UniProtKB/Swiss-Prot annotation:
Chief site of localization: nucleus
Family: Belongs to the NDC80/HEC1 family.
Coiled-coil region: 321-387, 473-592
Cross-referenced Gene3D superfamilies: Ncd80 complex, Ncd80 subunit
Oligomeric form and interacting partners: Component of the NDC80 complex, which consists of NDC80, NUF2, SPC24 and SPC25.
Gene Ontology MF terms: microtubule binding
Gene, per the UniProt record: NDC80
Localization (cell): Nucleus; Chromosome, Centromere, Kinetochore
Protein name: Probable kinetochore protein NDC80
Composition bias type Basic residues, residue spans: 1-10
Amino acid sequence: MNASAHKKRLSMMPGTSSASRPSMAGLPQRNNPPPQREPATPAVSELMRSSRRSMAFGRNPRQSSFGLVPQTPMAPMHTRDPRPVRDRHYQQQISQQIYEYLVTNHFEQETRHPLNQRTLSNPTQKDFKTMFEWIFRRIDPGYPFHKSIENEVHAVLRAAKYPWLDSITKSQIVAVGGQSWAYFSGMLHWMVELNTTIEKYHNHDYSGDDGPSLVDEIFNRHARESYFAYLQGDDRFARPDAELCLAEENAEFQEILAEQRAQNPLPEGEDDELDEELSRLEAKWGKIEEAKLLGKNLADDIVKLGAFVDARKEHNARYASQMSQATAEEDNVTSEVESLSRQKLKLQQTIQDQGLSPAELDKLHLDMERQQKALNSLDEIIDEGRQVVSNKESTALAVFDALDRVIKEYTSSVLSYNAWVASDNDLPEIPESVYLIDLREPLSEENLGRHPSVILGGVDPRNQIRPEIVRICNMVTSKVKALQEEALRLQEEIETNQEKLVSQKRHIGELEAKSRRLRETRNALEDSASMNENENSQNTERLENQFVQAQSETALAQSQLKGLQVRLQDAEHERNKLSVEVQQARERLSQDILKQAEVMVAFKAMVQTKLQDFEMFVRANVEEEIRGDHN
């Protein structure tokens, strides 16, 4: 590779003006179509689709951020390596390709590290580290290697999406060589192929393929320049020579278009013939569209005309049936008129045979009309009386039904109260004499004129039921107050338990923080213990004991927390239960008892008034009937 190509692959460190070959790790891949190039491995093709994008996330030029920022979690790769990496012939082939690549690109001069065939067949840990870092820096020049080699290799290959990462473990990276070197040489060969493919792409060397189209090439060129400007902190990329570049691209496009026309010329005169044929077809197509529109309008007119004809036929049929019906009615009326004329002649003949004069007939008619009017007036009076009696009876029945419903609701409420206080000795039950009310058919004849207390079975709602209900209501109110005080006491206890729970949670948080710090310390010691295990064994045991002690303290605190949570849940459950019972008892008893008392008092007054009115109405009707009989 020449020096100019090598200069294009500089790092994206801060302050560096070069924007070529930026880092690729850390950014999501776009769906830009890759250019056509020679075949490569699936992972190489996948990585090429990212177009060598940088890992930078900010607006200022910076170095590679891989290893400095958290990487996006990826699903583990479980693809089996299809390459025959354990085959000796294949190993020799890929080792030769790696060696040629390293020699061609001046590996020894840049790294000051010796290189020979033995280095690729039986390498040391330092050989592998030097080759790996040098090859990957050609992929990502801005990447800094800070961690140990076993951590760096895994992280770098995961970021580069090496498809067979499962075949390489950290323990194998610590001791490169032996049986595992076949997989490491395959990994280095994959990185060499990746570098080779990227270099061909940047040098527009598509090895006989068509490559990207002119439009794609122009777009990709502008996208690369815009992206590099974005990495340098320019959010609004605008080239100062935009018009000149546009003119150059247009000239390039016209030149390629002329070449394509020269390679594929049309026969002489064929273009004019095609234009004439197109004009003729367009004229025919306009006539066809007009014909289609005319046919559509005619079809609509035919449909409308058919609907009009059907409507007229239906109208004519309806008129014919009406005419036949009118003719039949006219014949019936004519026959009835003739029949009435014959009956009139017969009646006149009968009257003449009886010897009655017209004056006598008129007098008889007047008497008959007067008697008929008198009968009609009597019938109207009787109907009015029946209507009044029916209305009074329906009103009395409606009042009786309403009273019966009120008494049933009152009895049901008292029974519900007695069932509720059955388990509580502090509240008394309502005696049967208070809520057992029997109307004993108040509308029967034997109850006419009786006192309401007699009709209600000897129960006086005002002097017996109301005082008892007021006394029980006062007792229920005192019970509700006692339950409210108990609920306040439980609320105070719950608040105390909550404060204890908060303190326990704070203590648990401190213990968890201490445990987390100890765990982090232990992990750090375990990482360093792989290099110096004998020296740090005593410290590790001491930290493990502290960690176990912290875990035991955490378990004890968690058990105490669970106990407090159980007690808190029990107290909250008891408080909710008491609150619901108090609220239900207070609302139900206060409303139902007062409502029933008011209804019973109003019912007593209403029944007395209705019975007196009904008695006066019956007495008036009886006296009127007696006077009518005397008359």
